[in-house]
């Protein structure tokens, strides 16, 4: 036995016991010839006293074994911040397992951390830090909690293939060349979507999986090329059934991991409600700032730009930022104007009161009466700011949504506490792709459309067809997304046809699914939740990299291993691959 106790286990009740501890030396102190070590493992820290005749040369972060006796600390040295703070271990024997050959790039016990890329390059050192290991442990608890909940509710965990067929309808696939069949490729799954539908057809009526997924997409600030999702699918169910089981899981999770009781029923907002109220389909409602249609206050005004927008069917919308006038500088207004223009808007308007009688802001000289009218309706007080935008409603919603998000993140962190969890439903089934010059599925092409909408708009305006889809949003993040699925081959063919996929393309990409539908498919639906994002929210960290053991950078690089990297010519020859174009030597 290499240890009898962990470094976070011993208490005053253990005084007098002979124990064996093992771990890393966090720090060393020499007080008048008596050496004190702080020994650390993932469970905690324990103070060690070395005898004066101990001649071993010890370094920080050495991995050691300590055999000794637990003794009570002198009253004046008790550390109430440590679980083991009332005791120390007098070392009778020290065994060094390994010792650093050189100084570490950084030390886990230090408060000042290096750049993130250094932390990721030496992630094995970073993982020794308590806050990092605690997040990995929390991730484990989240996963176990979800597995237990779903298992108790009749779901079974089934593994689906990682090496599968490329069906590019969405992000790019990661491709894996086949050595045994040169010139052909597997794809790593972007999700187990098709396989979980096939499981439903196979009678596995309640399935789940904690599964790795892969997307070769242009990375944004907080995306990873490989990520983990909690994948759920169920047969003979309605949308309400999926939402109910997911709500129960989330409530159980928050209670078990955070000891937080969530309210009875989660709110449900439609996609259109979200966009019209917050300018986003995943708003953080904790910051308030709900939008209002203020067009009626500007029907008569002296501002030509507003008149032009209203006369062409546009709107004027705005929201109130309470107690913000002292922060609304010209510099900030100019920045928000540029953001609005980059999103296709004409800029923003804003106003506040210098005093109960004096208005300041953009266009105040021409719009004083209009602003006063708005202020009366919205109960705008001294030191409040009203932000407005005029134009086509979709652009106005997008502009105000981005402005609202920036103001909330930058200035109202005090409001962004607790948890705001709700559903968004009735997403558009299709969106137009300028790049492909056709309508594509906003979610995926296997989503069941609103059948009344399909009948009404399929020959006129596909953008008006709603999907039987839903997202769960937590604190401004889309944590999960799902839908009721199409289970009829003819309806699925019709959706592919509306997306202008040829019969040949459909057969090549999805023929196996359509064939399966012919042999009896039950009504089914499901949802996939991002484990990385959910854990990050529970841990209260801003990036999913903090809850992944070995994450990649925002550019998809692994600083630890150097991946992606070149491979040798022999490997390429075996795969019958010839490199061409621009590639790294």
UniProtKB/Swiss-Prot annotation:
Binding site for ATP: 215-217, 224, 478, 530-533
Location of the region described as Aspartate in the Swiss-Prot/TrEMBL record: 193-196
Gene field: aspS
GO cellular component, one term: cytoplasm
Species this chain originates from: Pseudothermotoga lettingae (strain ATCC BAA-301 / DSM 14385 / NBRC 107922 / TMO) (Thermotoga lettingae)
Catalytic reaction annotation: tRNA(Asp) + L-aspartate + ATP = L-aspartyl-tRNA(Asp) + AMP + diphosphate
Protein name as it appears in the record: Aspartate--tRNA ligase
Purpose: Catalyzes the attachment of L-aspartate to tRNA(Asp) in a two-step reaction: L-aspartate is first activated by ATP to form Asp-AMP and then transferred to the acceptor end of tRNA(Asp).
Keywords of this entry: Aminoacyl-tRNA synthetase, ATP-binding, Cytoplasm, Ligase, Nucleotide-binding, Protein biosynthesis
């Amino acid at each position: 036995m290499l240890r009898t106790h962990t470094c976070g286990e011993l208490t005053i009740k253990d005084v007098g016991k002979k124990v064996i501890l093992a771990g890393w030396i966090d720090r060393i102190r020499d007080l008048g010839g008596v050496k004190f070590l702080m020994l650390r493992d993932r469970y905690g820290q324990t103070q060690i006293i070395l005898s004066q005749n101990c001649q071993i040369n010890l370094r920080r972060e050495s991995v050691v074994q300590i055999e000794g006796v637990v003794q009570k600390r002198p009253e004046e040295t008790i550390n109430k911040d440590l679980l083991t703070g009332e005791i120390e271990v007098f070392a009778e024997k020290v065994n060094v397992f390994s010792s650093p050959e050189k100084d570490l790039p950084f030390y886990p016990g230090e408060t000042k951390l290096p750049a993130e890329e250094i932390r990721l390059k030496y992630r094995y050192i970073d993982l020794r830090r308590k806050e990092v290991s605690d997040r990995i442990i929390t991730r484990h608890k989240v996963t176990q909690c979800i597995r237990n909940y779903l298992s108790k509710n009749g779901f079974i965990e089934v593994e689906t293939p990682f090496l599968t067929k490329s069906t590019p309808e969405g992000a790019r696939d990661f491709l894996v060349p086949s050595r045994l069949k040169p010139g052909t490729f597997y794809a790593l799954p972007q999700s187990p979507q098709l396989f979980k539908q096939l499981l439903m057809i196979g009678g596995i009526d309640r399935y789940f999986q904690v599964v790795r997924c892969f997307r070769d997409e242009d990375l944004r600030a907080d995306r990873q090329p490989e990520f983990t999702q909690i994948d759920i699918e169920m047969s003979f169910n309605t949308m309400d059934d999926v939402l109910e089981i997911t709500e129960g899981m989330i409530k159980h999770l928050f209670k078990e991991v955070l000891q937080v009781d969530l309210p009875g029923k989660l709110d449900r907002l439609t996609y259109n409600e979200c966009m019209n109220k917050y300018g986003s389909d995943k708003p953080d409602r904790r910051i308030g700032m709900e939008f209002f249609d203020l067009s009626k206050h500007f029907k008569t005004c002296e501002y030509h730009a507003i008149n032009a927008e209203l006369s062409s069917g546009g709107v004027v919308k705005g929201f109130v930022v309470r107690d913000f006038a002292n922060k609304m500088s010209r510099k900030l207004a100019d920045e928000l104007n540029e953001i609005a223009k980059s999103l296709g808007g004409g800029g923003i308007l804003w106003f506040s009161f210098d005093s109960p009688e004096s208005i300041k802001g953009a266009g105040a000289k021409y719009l004083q009466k209009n602003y006063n009218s708005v202020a009366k309706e919205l109960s705008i007080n001294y030191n409040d700011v009203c932000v407005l935008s005029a134009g086509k409603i979709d652009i106005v919603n997008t502009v105000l949504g981005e402005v609202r998000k920036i103001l909330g993140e930058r200035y109202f962190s005090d409001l962004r506490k607790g948890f705001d969890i709700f559903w968004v439903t009735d997403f558009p089934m299709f969106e137009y792709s300028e790049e492909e010059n056709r309508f594509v599925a906003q979610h995926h092409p296997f989503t069941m459309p609103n059948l009344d909408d399909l009948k009404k708009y399929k020959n006129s305006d596909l953008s008006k067809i709603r999907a039987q889809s839903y997202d769960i949003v937590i604190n401004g993040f889309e944590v999960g997304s799902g839908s009721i699925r199409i289970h009829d081959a003819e309806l699925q063919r019709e959706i592919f046809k509306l997306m202008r996929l040829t019969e040949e393309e459909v057969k090549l990409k999805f023929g196996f699914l359509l064939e399966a539908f012919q042999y009896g498919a039950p009504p089914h639906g499901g949802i996939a939740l991002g484990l990385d994002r959910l854990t990050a929210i529970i841990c209260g960290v801003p990036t999913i990299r903090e809850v992944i053991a070995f994450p990649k950078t925002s550019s998809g690089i692994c600083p630890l291993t150097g991946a992606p990297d070149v491979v040798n010519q022999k490997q390429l020859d075996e795969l019958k691959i010839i490199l061409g174009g621009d590639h790294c030597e």
